[in-house]
Amino acid sequence: KFICPDGVDWDVFLDALNNLGVRYTKEKPCFQIDVYFDTPQYILLNSGAAVRIRQSGEAYIGAYKVSQNQQGAIFERREFEWKLSDNETKLWNDEKKPTIPPTIIDKLNLHEQTLRKVLAVETHRHIAVVNGNDGFKAELSLDEVTFRGHKGQAHYREIEVELLNGRLEQLKQLADSLQNHLKLQPAVDSKYKKGLILVGKYGITPPMH
């Protein structure tokens, strides 16, 4: 993941891919809203985890993410997703109550603390899918983000390179090429952490790991 510089828009990004000789197909841009939850003591944040409900089109999808390894701009994470049923979606829209499967709750180790909404993230996402040799496949996205939290709102732009299939080494090569070509700075924080730093309650500065 990289911080997207002001001078780089989607056209500039695609030009860079063309100049690098990368084969890609453009996907339809999308808009999504993520709502993140944590305990009053920010147990999830402090353990490198995140729980969110995402609205994308008509679908509502929950996710639990936990960091495993990070080297510069490369994040390795485990991710568990679940789709909200019609009834669960209604409960979410009417009462803002998230439905989280018991198996996920067990993993969270909340120590009987309750989860509450701590951050909303609105993302306009442009997407290109790269198909390389040996079955290598990666999703590239340029995100125009608005964070909404206790301290108001803040804007942020990010470039993400996600491995869909193939070797991590191939992903690193692609990420390095883009970083050098566009002079990108690594994004060292997850979106959740970045949002809390910018607009979180009391200007919380999450502990550095």
Features from the language model and the residues they span:
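Phosphate-end processing signature that detects enzymes handling 5′-triphosphorylated RNA
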Residues: 1-209
